[in-house]
UniProtKB/Swiss-Prot annotation:
Family: Belongs to the SPIN/STSY family.
Pfam families hit by this protein: Spin-Ssty
Gene Ontology BP term (one): gamete generation
Full protein name: Y-linked testis-specific protein 1
Gene3D superfamilies documented for this protein: Spindlin/Ssty (2.80.10.70)
PANTHER family recorded: SPINDLIN
Naturally occurring in which organism (per UniProt): Mus musculus (Mouse)
Length: 232
């Protein structure tokens, strides 16, 4: 493909992206010598600091994928599925506001029927789906999305006492950490590298990091030269 065609493709993709947030999509996925698989998802958002990256929630999967939908070579036959999705209104706006920024215990049921509690932090409501919340966990710092209002009312989510909701900062505020590269050392001594791409408005010490070659976003509390999370 000529450089001119590449430039045109990037320009067209950028223009299209502004119109597909909140839309359902389908595409094929081909990685290496693995068989081609088929996927359907909803586009939740664009990353404010890098609009070519999309927050994508695939059907039946709770973790959030962050992908360059129009330039990732593994994505084939990308289609926007009509019509645009209509989302339900939040029934308890007060509870929704109270959850954001809070540390919580989230109860899950294992395949064998036993229960386990995971400690996490509610980061934000999903902008286009207010009944869906971004959340991350101490044992797994990836970004997830769940319908937490239902879980709370069913007794499967509890706000941890003495952790008041954080005061949301302005989205216009800038932060010197955004755009910086970070180095992460695993328990086995190997390293991976990533970039700080976003500061969580409700928790100013919490940041999203996109590691090189990874299709997920990871959530860390950052202080100078330290990532305050359990190493994976």
């Amino acid at each position: 493909m000529s450089s001119l065609m590449k430039k045109r493709r990037r320009k067209s993709s950028s223009n299209t992206l502004r119109n597909i947030v909140s839309c359902r999509i389908s595409h094929s996925w081909k990685e290496g010598n693995e068989p081609v698989t088929q996927w359907k998802a909803i586009v939740l958002d664009q990353l404010p600091t890098n609009p070519s990256l999309y927050f994508v929630k695939y059907d039946g999967i709770d973790s959030i994928y962050v992908l360059e939908l129009y330039s990732d070579d593994r994505i084939l036959n990308l289609k926007v599925l009509p019509p645009i999705v209509v989302f339900p209104q939040v029934r308890d706006a007060h509870l929704a506001r109270a959850l954001v920024g809070r540390a919580v215990q989230h109860k899950f049921e294992r395949k064998d029927g036993s229960e386990v509690n995971w400690r996490g932090v509610v980061l934000a409501q999903v902008p286009i789906m207010k009944d869906l919340f971004y959340i991350t966990y101490k044992k797994d710092p990836a970004l997830y999305a769940y319908q937490l209002l239902d879980d709370y009312k069913e007794g499967n989510l509890h706000m941890i006492p003495d952790t008041p909701p954080a005061e949301e900062r302005s989205g216009d505020d800038s932060d010197v950490l955004i755009g910086n590269w970070v180095e992460y050392t695993r328990k086995d001594g190997s390293k991976k590298f990533g970039k700080v791409v976003y500061q969580v408005l409700a928790n100013p010490s919490v940041y999203f990091i996109k590691f090189h070659g990874d299709i997920h976003i990871y959530v860390y509390t950052m202080v100078p030269k330290i990532l305050e999370v359990e190493k994976s």
